[in-house]
């Protein structure tokens, strides 16, 4: 794993975002922010606000700090706004798109599917979660893995995301396959983040 183990609900509460379905249920049961029914919290400094936003982005893609820094460096060299380019860069990771497609339930599960060799791209096994998928690449579960329980659940829509599948993906869950039709644009990516604060954190 990219990060040290920590209870996902506790981590979700600290960051103010639901990282797993269990955390979603927790937030539904306790819609108030941490501290509202306990001792008050100090007002955060600008640095802490930026740090929190950076940590939130890291958590949603389950990245190490080094991985996020590398993605930021690549994004800063594009002709796009650095923040938008950063999120798009991360969204093209293989594990992120396995999650978006509905083949996996969480980013953690998606990462394990890739690492354990269950996923192929254009007919070739890829076991690196950081692999960057390109437009027109076809991603699917390997034939030898399709009868595993997890993939049987996925095939029946058990892991399908709430709402619409992102428009940049063409998904066939029955075949446990999807294609990246085009590069995502930031507004389509279901990530909770003010990426400009992340840029400000690294540019300080």
Curated annotation (Swiss-Prot):
Keywords: Ribonucleoprotein, Ribosomal protein, RNA-binding, rRNA-binding. SMART domains: Ribosomal_S4 (SM01390), S4 (SM00363). One of its GO terms (biological process) is ribosomal small subunit biogenesis. Residues 92-153 form the S4 RNA-binding domain. It comes from the Bacteria. It holds the Pfam family Ribosomal_S4. Coiled coil: none annotated. PROSITE patterns: RIBOSOMAL_S4, S4. GO terms for molecular function: rRNA binding; structural constituent of ribosome. Signal peptide: none annotated. One of the primary rRNA binding proteins, it binds directly to 16S rRNA where it nucleates assembly of the body of the 30S subunit. Belongs to the universal ribosomal protein uS4 family. NCBIfam families: PRK05327.1 (NF003717), rpsD_bact (TIGR01017). Part of the 30S ribosomal subunit. Contacts protein S5. The interaction surface between S4 and S5 is involved in control of translational fidelity. This is Small ribosomal subunit protein uS4. The lineage of its organism: Bacteria, Bacillati, Actinomycetota, Actinomycetes, Kitasatosporales. The gene is rpsD.
């Amino acid at each position: 794993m990219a990060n040290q183990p920590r209870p996902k609900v506790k981590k979700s509460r600290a960051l103010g975002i639901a990282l797993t379905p269990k955390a979603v249920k927790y937030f539904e049961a306790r819609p108030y922010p941490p501290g509202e029914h306990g001792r008050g919290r100090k007002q955060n400094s600008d640095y802490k606000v930026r740090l929190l936003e950076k940590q939130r982005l890291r958590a949603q893609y389950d990245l190490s700090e080094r991985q996020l820094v590398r993605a930021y460096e690549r994004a800063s060299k594009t002709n796009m706004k650095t923040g938008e380019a950063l999120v798009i860069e991360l969204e093209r990771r293989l594990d992120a798109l396995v999650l978006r497609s509905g083949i996996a339930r969480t980013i953690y599960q998606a990462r394990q599917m890739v690492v354990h060799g269950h996923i192929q791209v254009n007919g070739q096994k890829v076991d690196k979660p950081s692999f960057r998928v390109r437009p027109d690449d076809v991603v699917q579960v390997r034939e030898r893995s399709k009868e595993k329980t997890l993939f049987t659940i996925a095939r029946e829509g058990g892991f399908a995301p709430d709402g619409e599948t992102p428009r940049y993906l063409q998904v066939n869950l029955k075949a446990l396959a999807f294609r990246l039709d085009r590069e995502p644009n930031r507004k389509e990516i279901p990530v909770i983040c003010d990426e400009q604060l992340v840029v400000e954190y690294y540019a300080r």
